[in-house]
Curated annotation (Swiss-Prot):
<dbReference type="InterPro" id="IPR002314">
    <property type="entry name" value="aa-tRNA-synt_IIb"/>
</dbReference>
<keyword id="KW-0436">Ligase</keyword>
<dbReference type="InterPro" id="IPR006195">
    <property type="entry name" value="aa-tRNA-synth_II"/>
</dbReference>
<dbReference type="InterPro" id="IPR045864">
    <property type="entry name" value="aa-tRNA-synth_II/BPL/LPL"/>
</dbReference>
<dbReference type="InterPro" id="IPR004154">
    <property type="entry name" value="Anticodon-bd"/>
</dbReference>
<comment type="subunit">
    <text>Homodimer.</text>
</comment>
<keyword id="KW-0648">Protein biosynthesis</keyword>
<dbReference type="InterPro" id="IPR023716">
    <property type="entry name" value="Prolyl-tRNA_ligase_IIa_type2"/>
</dbReference>
<protein>
    <recommendedName>
        <fullName>Proline--tRNA ligase</fullName>
        <ecNumber>6.1.1.15</ecNumber>
    </recommendedName>
</protein>
<dbReference type="GO" id="GO:0005829">
    <property type="term" value="C:cytosol"/>
</dbReference>
<dbReference type="InterPro" id="IPR044140">
    <property type="entry name" value="ProRS_anticodon_short"/>
</dbReference>
<keyword id="KW-0030">Aminoacyl-tRNA synthetase</keyword>
<comment type="similarity">
    <text>Belongs to the class-II aminoacyl-tRNA synthetase family. ProS type 2 subfamily.</text>
</comment>
<dbReference type="InterPro" id="IPR004500">
    <property type="entry name" value="Pro-tRNA-synth_IIa_bac-type"/>
</dbReference>
<dbReference type="InterPro" id="IPR033730">
    <property type="entry name" value="ProRS_core_prok"/>
</dbReference>
<keyword id="KW-0963">Cytoplasm</keyword>
<keyword id="KW-0067">ATP-binding</keyword>
Length: 441
């Protein structure tokens, strides 16, 4: 894409309404625009990042055996009355009526609807286990939406729901999603720490929040530093091997980790001072087993091998892609702007033409631009008639991983400058060497 032809509405000043760095940078980088309180339009740069995050989430969900569906945003109130949640959910749920005066709602979550889909088609234990997921916009009427897309009223959410014959089967599905989440966050360039979460009235131990460390995080967290040394399974992991999955979950839950709400001072005191880590963190995912909470009132049953009907045991697994965009920025930025991990950067390269009216500079830029596109990359060419300083500031602000700087002096020596956005390290290469180096990545 040529920046002269792209829609990138940058802001020079920090917006006064933005309280945290991710909100400021997303507005300044032209990623989002607030339409009303807690509701945002996603502009081209932000949409590209959001799509890349969703792509990684899909890949890891399907690697773990989840199957994608798409459920509507508008739901019937009757389903929620079946589960007894319609009146209990509170003012966060947006309730509406159609022209026939039927009660509807803008879905804040999808347990009832996915349970209805399941009970409509699945009859036998032979069809289990089953894990259905979707990525859809949701709405919760927050009292005080703030922090941009970190806590908005409308947000994009990936929900997966597992269905098993019994609790033992649910544990296997839970472990599968636990490992899938570790891999998902790793692919996004994040180090996520699973922390025991409150299971509420259902009880049990199958509930974890995944927290990333960030200085501006909303939660205080306490964990053993050994977490920082653990290795996330690579793509060769066999999700059908129950023993391997159980061992990975055991490894990642054997050290102390808790948010402030679940913190246990007695357990914390057992950890040596050298291994204690107190920090701030951001929740980026939550997995939860809720048993028959929905299958019982909604009659989601299957015929077991024993010839009897069994209520299915369910689990829920959530990741918010729109929230993740902000979380990544909170964890990866500097005073000049965003620093995107390569896996979700909106463009792979930023090519800076320091002097567009110089024939040699323009020729070198065109050669790089076309060569990188031919190699399968998505470069952004800044071909605007702007000052070099303005172009450098733009590239730093939007955070592309690699900058290729093309100026008259370097081109005269048949070279261009490569700058790593994260480290700031620069090196000079010929145009041919640049194309040779990156065409094999």
């Amino acid at each position: 894409m040529r920046l002269s032809q792209y829609f990138l509405p940058l802001l020079k000043e920090n917006p006064k309404e933005a309280e945290i760095i991710s909100h400021r940078l997303m507005l300044r980088a032209g990623m989002i625009r607030q339409q009303t309180s807690g509701i945002y339009s996603w502009l081209p740069l932000g949409k590209k990042v959001l799509d890349k995050i969703c792509k990684i989430i899909r890949e890891e969900q399907e690697r773990a055996g989840a199957i994608e569906i798409l459920m509507p945003t508008i739901q019937s109130a009757d389903l929620w009355r079946e589960s007894d949640r319609y009146d209990d959910y509170g003012l966060e749920m947006l309730r509406i009526k159609d022209r026939q005066k039927r009660d509807l709602l803008y879905g804040p979550t999808n347990e009832e609807m996915v349970t209805d889909i399941f009970r409509s088609y699945i009859r036998s234990y032979k069809d289990l286990p089953l894990n259905l997921y979707h990525i859809q916009w949701k709405f919760r009427d927050e009292i005080r939406p703030r922090f941009g897309v970190m806590r908005s009223r409308e947000f994009l959410m990936k929900d997966a729901y597992s269905f098993d014959l019994d609790y033992e089967g649910s544990k296997i599905s839970y472990n599968r999603m636990f490992v899938a989440y570790l891999r998902t966050f790793s692919c996004l360039g994040l180090k996520a720490i699973p922390m025991r979460a409150d299971t509420g009235p259902i009880g049990g131990k199958l509930s974890h929040e995944f927290i990333i460390l960030a200085e501006t995080g909303e939660s205080a967290i306490f964990c053993d530093k050994h977490f920082l040394e653990l290795t996330v399974p690579d793509s060769s992991i066999d999700f059908s091997d129950k023993a391997i999955l159980a061992n990975i979950v055991k490894q990642w839950t054997s050290f102390y980790a808790a948010t402030e709400e679940m913190h246990d001072e007695e357990e914390w005191a057992k950890i040596s001072d050298n291994n204690r880590l107190s920090a701030r963190g951001i929740e980026v995912g939550h997995i939860f087993h809720f048993g028959t909470k929905y299958s019982a009132p909604m009659g989601a049953k299957v015929m077991g091998q024993d010839g009897k009907e069994h209520l299915v045991s369910m689990g829920s697994y959530g990741i918010g892609p729109s929230r993740l965009v902000a979380a990544v920025i909170e964890a990866s930025h500097d005073e000049n702007g965003i620093i995107w991990p390569k896996s979700i950067a909106p463009f792979d390269f930023g090519i800076i033409n320091m002097k567009p009216d110089d024939e040699k500079c323009t020729h070198a830029c065109e050669t790089l631009y076309k060569g990188l596109r031919y190699a399968g990359f998505d470069p952004l060419l800044d071909d605007r008639n702007e000052r070099p300083g303005s172009k450098f500031a733009t590239m730093d602000l939007i955070g592309l991983p690699t900058q290729i700087i093309v100026g008259p002096k370097s081109v005269a020596q048949n070279e261009v400058e490569i700058k790593d956005r994260k480290t700031g390290i620069k090196k000079s290469l010929t145009v041919e060497n640049v194309l040779n180096q990156f065409s094999v990545i």
